[in-house]
Amino acid sequence: MILKDKKILITGILTDKSIAFATAKIAIENGATVVATGFGKGLRITERAVKRLSEDIKVFEMDIENLNQVNEAVKNIEDEVGNLDGILHAI
């Protein structure tokens, strides 16, 4: 398990055909804790998509173009899962 105890944020988990979904699946299979983000209508889609991967994935609201949302998401992620070891922005 090469990613054991690593925490990775993945954006863009919307469908099981996305690069983000495939990356999250591989990361989980290799021991990582995955957190995800979404915004607007995509937030609900992301919440549904991650359930197909794991019930343990936390989803945070974040639009990368909204600095206030980014700052809030960073704070919430740090509070709930600690420091991240990696980020994949796959939108």
Identify the meaning behind each predicted range.
Residues E61-M62, G82-I91:
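Rossmann-fold scaffold of SDR-type NAD(P)-dependent oxidoreductases
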Residues V50-N68:
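Rossmann-fold cofactor-recognition segment
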Residues E65-E80:
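Conserved Rossmann-fold cofactor-binding substructure of NAD(P)-dependent oxidoreductases
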Residues A24-I28, K51-R52, N76:
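Short, solvent-exposed amphipathic alpha-helical segments in soluble enzyme
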Residues K41-E47:
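Short, charged/polar "capping" segments at the starts of alpha-helices
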Residues I2-K41:
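Canonical Rossmann dinucleotide-binding motif of NAD(H)/NADP(H)-dependent dehydrogenases/reductases
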Residues F21-A22, R48, E72:
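Generic recognition of short, well-ordered alpha-helical segments
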Residues L9, V35, K58-F60, I87:
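Conserved Rossmann-like nucleotide-binding pocket used by diverse enzymes
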